[in-house]
């Protein structure tokens, strides 16, 4: 069984036991979160149902790799280098359930 969930403006294809990195969620480590924005669920047949819930456990709150932003204008000696590290939450999917 797999599901497509939406969190942080992005969509993720998940199944039970998978580990994903998402935009930062307001949750503590080892806390269980419910994701209600489920696009579709499949168990050998596709079901676009709005009453599905995905439960996940927060494994870690950390920061992602550094992203480098480099601006340049040729022949003008204009160069700017900047970068940042995005905050992320690492989740383990524990359960995908359809509510009736």
UniProtKB/Swiss-Prot annotation:
GO terms for biological process: translation. Keywords: Ribonucleoprotein, Ribosomal protein, RNA-binding, rRNA-binding. One of its GO terms (cellular component) is cytoplasm. Disulfide bonds: none annotated. Transmembrane segments: none annotated. It holds the Pfam family Ribosomal_L21p. Part of the 50S ribosomal subunit. Contacts protein L20. This protein binds to 23S rRNA in the presence of protein L20. Belongs to the bacterial ribosomal protein bL21 family. This is Large ribosomal subunit protein bL21.
């Amino acid at each position: 069984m797999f599901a497509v969930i939406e969190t942080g403006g992005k969509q993720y294809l998940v199944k039970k036991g998978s580990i994903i990195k998402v935009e930062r969620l307001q949750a503590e480590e080892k806390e269980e979160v419910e994701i209600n924005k489920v696009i579709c669920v499949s168990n050998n047949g596709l079901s676009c149902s709005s009453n599905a819930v995905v439960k996940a456990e927060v494994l870690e709150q950390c920061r992602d790799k550094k992203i480098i932003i480099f601006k340049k204008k040729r022949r003008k000696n204009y160069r700017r280098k900047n970068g940042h590290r995005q905050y992320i939450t690492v989740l383990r999917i524990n359960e995908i359930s359809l509510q009736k």
